[in-house]
Structures are given as structure tokens and as C-alpha cells.
Curated annotation (Swiss-Prot):
Purpose of the protein: Essential component of the mitotic checkpoint, which prevents cells from prematurely exiting mitosis. Required for the assembly of the dynein-dynactin, Mad2 complexes and spindly/CG15415 onto kinetochores. During cytokinesis in male meiotic cells it is required for completion of cleavage furrow ingression, possibly in conjunction with Rint1. Required for maintenance of Golgi stack number and morphology, and acroblast assembly. Its function related to the spindle assembly machinery is proposed to depend on its association in the RZZ complex.
Record protein name field: Centromere/kinetochore protein zw10
GO CC list: acroblast; Dsl1/NZR complex; endoplasmic reticulum; Golgi stack; kinetochore; kinetochore microtubule; nucleus; RZZ complex
Annotated organism of origin: Drosophila melanogaster
PANTHER family in the record: CENTROMERE/KINETOCHORE PROTEIN ZW10, CENTROMERE_KINETOCHORE PROTEIN ZW10 HOMOLOG
Alphabetized Pfam families for the sequence: ZW10_C, ZW10_C2, Zw10_middle, Zw10_N
Entry keyword NAD: no
Family classification: Belongs to the ZW10 family.
Amino acid sequence: MEEEAPRFNVLEEAFNGNGNGCANVEATQSAILKVLTRVNRFQMRVRKHIEDNYTEFLPNNTSPDIFLEESGSLNREIHDMLENLGSEGLDALDEANVKMAGNGRQLREILLGLGVSEHVLRIDELFQCVEEAKATKDYLVLLDLVGRLRAFIYGDDSVDGDAQVATPEVRRIFKALECYETIKVKYHVQAYMLQQSLQERFDRLVQLQCKSFPTSRCVTLQVSRDQTQLQDIVQALFQEPYNPARLCEFLLDNCIEPVIMRPVMADYSEEADGGTYVRLSLSYATKEPSSAHVRPNYKQVLENLRLLLHTLAGINCSVSRDQHVFGIIGDHVKDKMLKLLVDECLIPAVPESTEEYQTSTLCEDVAQLEQLLVDSFIINPEQDRALGQFVEKYETYYRNRMYRRVLETAREIIQRDLQDMVLVAPNNHSAEVANDPFLFPRCMISKSAQDFVKLMDRILRQPTDKLGDQEADPIAGVISIMLHTYINEVPKVHRKLLESIPQQAVLFHNNCMFFTHWVAQHANKGIESLAALAKTLQATGQQHFRVQVDYQSSILMGIMQEFEFESTHTLGSGPLKLVRQCLRQLELLKNVWANVLPETVYNATFCELINTFVAELIRRVFTLRDISAQMACELSDLIDVVLQRAPTLFREPNEVVQVLSWLKLQQLKAMLNASLMEITELWGDGVGPLTASYKSDEIKHLIRALFQDTDWRAKAITQIV
């Protein structure tokens, strides 16, 4: 009040000095000079205070509060003077308008200078408050003070509504002051020291340790249970300037990624260090995963992630109106975490069979994890859709996984040896099969083919209870793909053996026929392209079997190529040796085919091979132009060897009559031993038994070779028409 008395005296002198209440120009100028003098003295004291603090750095115990009070008093006095000048003095003293306007400008300049001084004083006051808050370790107050300092120094209007932010003119003059750079440096020092102090305190409350060994690593996380202190520090630390990259990198590299990628042993305790900390220890191998690497079970991965979030839950406080600590951490780790989780954990955990699919809770578990991450503010459910999209694509993942697993198993079966065989349909003999076309004949197939059929049976037995009426069967088409794979791959994988080993080709033929029969039996199971598939299977098996039959025929023909007559009078030993060699070749083939092929297929095949051999033998005989009696006898004996041994190649010897040239061979033997009359009788004027196998020219040729040129021969030849 004592300081306010002179102010009112000056005003009273200025506006009532003439005794009649009229304003006096000289009195007003005198009052302004007095105020200016007081302001100059005040600014000199403020300047010295600022220089001591921010230029000379001298000891100074003066409180800025004293200067702020005086500055406020001068501000109010000048504003009152300006108001009175505007409402009373200027209206009454028209003759002094110019001088009074100049006085007004002078007062406003004084007021601007006071504003700058007050701005600097308030900054100084905030610095002193910072020191006091540091002494009490009140970090939230410290953070607020540092924010207000920034508002005063840099003109940030959004930091604090209570901060008396200066006008643009005051800011401009303030930034031109010599002390401005020093004030900025001091502010940055205080901000850095606050950040370091908060980080050190945070590191004591949240302890992250990683110990590495030659082949393993142990990671320990300890979080203080003092929630009040912990959240105060976290709220102060996790402000906008703070960069949590180091913390996020540690969590991602040492905790999140290993938990997803490797088997991890987790040890959780809520009573660490005498109950003052929550502790989570993670131990895992660091050796690079090999081909035999076993992925951790997805349930264990999700449980370990929950433990990690639960351990760190104490730091997940709100740092602003719309942001939490886990949200800040999530911005740094969520993209890689979600990608690893889906690609390396969840997709490999998708079931590979419908039995597993029926009991799997993978979708429910993923949905629960997603909700946990949303509730923890790590992910935004509208933007971070990786887990939701996994659930949406679950059926596709399942179908692809099942297809891939089935085809991998099918390919593994295809690689197995065809020679490892097993008897099927042991009681379905040819007679029963002939009467019932739906029966598969008794034969041998590869054990791998039997396993292949078991795999297809297992696929067809897969329950589809979870599929809706409109949903496609997840196994649709896989049978067709498997069988086409078998058809295409077996000839490639076993090419050399199929070409060189007769039994391999026969087994592949039987396998294809067995698959054809299986497809026909399951015609009502929705197998894609059923008819075309059955035809392809049948044609493929027959094609490779035909190649082997033709090869065996070529062997017989190769032997018969050396069949030559040493002379016209005697047969010699060569032809008999070659005939026996052909029969021996057929007997060897019988040993590998008789119990493997279905009986009807075996009989038809051997009839064809024997016919090839017999037809060539007959052709060779008919190349002779002259056959002596001795030669005819020896040829008869040669043919008799064939007639005796060929029937033994069949399970039922009578099957030999199905050989096309068999009757012709028998009749040839008969003609070699017959007289001229007997031959003509067998011809019987073109209606005898010989006409079933021979043409007239063949009979004439044989008569000319067997008999000398006589009238009887000529007469007989004339009867052969």
C-alpha cells in the first residue's frame, strides 16, 4: 500500500492541479516523467538480476517474485494513466492533442518494456521452481514446469492454459535479448537432466537383463510392484519427446521374437526380491534352427505372450487423453510381432486333417489373444487386422495345409519300391470275377499302392460336421489330384526299373487297375472328373504293361532270328536249342508273372507271347522248299517239344488252345507225319479241318516240299483249291 500512495499522488497532481478539475498538459507530462523514472530504475534492477543469473552467472539470492509484484504495480499504474488520458485529458485539452498523443506512445513503449521484463522474470521464476521440484523428486510437477518453460521460451501456446504467453511484440524483443541463448541452453540442460533422471528411475523400477551363453540366452524382466511410483515415473517419461526405441528393441529381439520362433522355458514369479518386484525369466537356445527344428506349440507361444504382457502391465498407464504406454510400444513392435506370429506360429499350427480340425480351438485362441492386445492398447482393432484376417482365412489355410500334407504323404508313398508287394482279393478267382464285374480279381499289387488307397480312404472318412450346407467340402478334388500325381510321377521315379524289370511293369499295371476299381466303388463320393480319371488310370497301366509285353515279344523274336536250317536233309541241333531257349524265356516270365497278374490277364498275355513264338516257328518251317523224310521227322519232334511244354505255362493247361496259332502248329505236325492222301483228306476239298488254319497256297507249298514231283503229287495239288 505504501508503494501505491505515490502513484495516486502523481495522478491527483496530474488531473486536479488547476483546482477546477481540468486536465493540465504540463502536469500530465510531469506525471509521465515520474513514472518513466521509476520504470527505468526498475528495469535497471531487473537487468542486473538477469545479467547475474544468465550472463555473469554470479551468486544471486534475489527472488523474482519481488520484481514481478513491482512490475505488476507499474503495469496497472500505466494502464490507469492511459485510460485517464483517453477519457478525460484528451477531451479537455484540445490544444495539446499532439503532445498528449506522444505521451501515450511513450507510455505504451514503457509498458512493452515492462512486458519483456516480466516475461524474463517469469522464466526465471520457473527455473527456480524446477530446482525446488527436483529437490522433492516430484517428477510430474517437474515435467509440467519444463513444459511451461518451453511455452515461454519458444512460444508454444498449447502447453499450458495457465501460462501467461507473451504477445508477439514481447516474444520478438525477448528473442533479441542477449540472455535468450543462455536461457535456451539452460532449458535444454534442465530438460535433458529431467529425461536422464526419469530414465534412471525407470531403469530401477523396470529392470531388463539379458545374459548370453555360447548356445543359449536368459532374459529377465523385473517390474516394481509400487504402482504409484511406477506410474508417476512412466507418465512423466513417456511424453511426446521420449523415444522408447531401446526398450522396444529389447522386447522385440530378446522376448517377443524368441517366444514366437523358439521353444522357450518361462518362469514367472510375483514375489521377487521380497515381494517388491514381479519377475519373468525366459530361457531359450540361440543356435540357428536346423531342419529338425521343432516349432513351439502355439498354445505355449500365446501363453508366454500373455505372461510377458502381464509382467509389464504395471507400466501400461495412460500418458495422454488417447494414448497408453503399450500403445506407444505397440507402434514400434506390432507390425513385426503380428507378421511373425501369423507366419511362423499360427499358420504352421493350422490342422492338417479333419480330425484335428474338429477339435482345434485355434480360432478361439487367436480371437482371445487379439482381444487381449486390443484391451492392452497394443493394437488398433480397426487398423491392425492381421489376427482377424487370419481367422477369416482359417478355412483356406486349413484346406491348403491338408492338401499339402496329403500330397506330401502321397509323394512319399510314390517314392517307395514297387517290388514290395501284397496279395489282394485272394478269394476272387477268375470264375467269380467273370460273373461279377464289380469284383476285383485276385492278384498282387505294390504295398505302396495299398497304402495309397488307405490314405484315400482316410480322406473320404474325414468328418465334415463343421461345414455348413453352402460350404465346399475341403477334400473336394484332392483324390483326383493324388491319383493324377501317381500317374505322372511313378513312371518318372521308377522309369529304369519299369523298363528293365518285368515284374515292376506288371505291378504298376495292377496298381492302376486297383485304383480304377477303387474309383468306381466310390463313384458317389464326389470325386472330380470320375469317368476321365478312371479311363486315364486304365490307359496308363495298360500302356506301361504293353511296353513290357512288346519288349518280351522282341526278346522271343530276337532268339528266333538265329533260327536257321543247316541243310535240307537234316535239322541239326541249332533250331531245337533256340526253341528250348524261347520256352525257357517264357518259363522265366511265368515265374515272375503267374502269381502277380490276374489270371485272365496272365492267360491273355501268354497266349499272345506264345503265339508270337509259334507263328514265327511255323513261318520258318514254311521257308523250306524241300523237306526230306528225316527232316520232317525231326521237325515233328521239334514241334512236339513246343506242344508238350507250352501248356505247362498256364495254370490250366487247356488255356493253351486260346493261342491263335496253336491249332495251326498241331496241324503242321500232323502234316509232317501224314501221307499225301491223308493231307488231301484233311483239306477235304476246302471244307476239311486244315482250312481253319491254312490257305490253299500254304498246303500246296508244304506238299511240294514234302513229296517228290510225281503224278500223285500233281493230282493232290489239283485237289487243293
